Design a protein with these regions (language model features):
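An amphipathic, aromatic/His-enriched active-site/gating alpha helix that lines ligand/cofactor pockets
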Residues: 75-104
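Short S/T/G/P-rich N-terminal loop/turn motif that feeds into the first structured element of a domain
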Residues: 1-65, 79-80, 103-133
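Ligand-binding pocket scaffold of soluble enzyme catalytic domains
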Residues: 69
Length: 133
């Protein structure tokens, strides 16, 4: 299992943070390389996005499963990130890449730490399941 946590912009005086966790099972080995390339592009986008406090990535390459956990200073900035490139392209392509169980969940937190146990627990009742082919 590979895991990475990155602090982008500490939360300072912010009282409530917006957290989003995703589980991204990839349905075929042929999509792994394109997915990893896209992940690197989106990671660069994350590091330059205002309003992001921190993010974490987790990978179980053997089972083609990937997780993300992002912590945002305000919910409003998330939409700008999601609809900007390259993330917007990743969303379009994910309908082809997604395996069974791909989902995300949102919640608010006062500490906004990268807590994988909490994220995994919350993903048991996701906000949204991606439709798979």
């Amino acid at each position: 299992m590979v895991e990475r946590k990155v602090e982008v912009d500490g939360n300072g005086e912010i009282q409530e943070l917006h957290c989003i966790a995703t589980i991204l099972p990839i349905r075929s080995w042929r999509y792994i390389i394109p997915f990893l390339r896209m992940t690197a592009r989106v990671q660069k986008q994350l590091e330059h996005t205002r309003g992001l406090a921190r993010y974490g990535l987790k990978a179980d390459l053997l089972h083609k499963r990937f997780w993300t956990l992002t912590v945002w200073q305000k919910k409003e900035v998330v939409q700008g990130f999601v609809t900007s490139e390259p993330h917007a392209e990743a969303v379009r392509r994910f309908k082809d890449w997604a395996g069974e169980g791909a989902a995300f969940v949102e919640w608010t937190s006062t500490n906004g730490t990268i807590d994988w146990n909490t994220a995994m627990q919350k993903l048991q009742n996701p906000t949204f399941y991606y439709k798979t082919k």
